[in-house]
Amino acid sequence: GIALLREAGLPLCLNTTFTRHNAADMERIVSFAKENGIPIRMTSYLFPPLRCGREANESCFLPPEEFGRLGAAFDSLTMNADQKKRRAELLAQIRQKSPALPDRGRAASCMAGRGAFWVTWDGRLLPCGMLPKLGAPLKEAGFSALWAGFGEKMDAQRLPGACSGCPRRILCPVCAAVTQSADEPPEALCRYCGSYMEAMARMRENGAD
């Protein structure tokens, strides 16, 4: 399938999510992407299945600390020298507890509700598949009307205060979909960031970067 997409001249990017079942394949996945000249991104955090109130399948999840180590290893494999230097400078800034950058207070840094949307199986339009409460049935208002209101809805979302002012905010993948709350910070992501920073520091000390 990938070969056919490339032959057709279509832009291609690999998005990977690592779980207990494929974490050991990370180096091979990255090697495949490099050998074929395909950009690759890693997602190490699995969102809880919010839409139907289902319990998360813990058999797929890795502990936040392991996600952090995987994230550091992935970045070490995929970043060039300049990117690694900038990342080291960023981590040093975080350790000095510099304040978060002003634009990092947004509750979602992705394109949800601004350049991307979801349509559910039952015809609801959502700005993000993990924010079902912000959606509405397409039959009631139509796409244009619902889409026009998504930007305002996303801007109204708020992160917990501890997240908005956290020095790690520039590194952390936290967003409104992760927290589902304007009060409680996601403790798992705090552990993820700590593990990531420790792993990057160890690799730098050992000359792995």
For each feature predicted by the language model, list its residue ranges.
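Flexible mid-to-C-terminal extensions adjoining Fe-S/redox cofactors in radical SAM and related proteins
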Residues: R104-A107, G129-D209
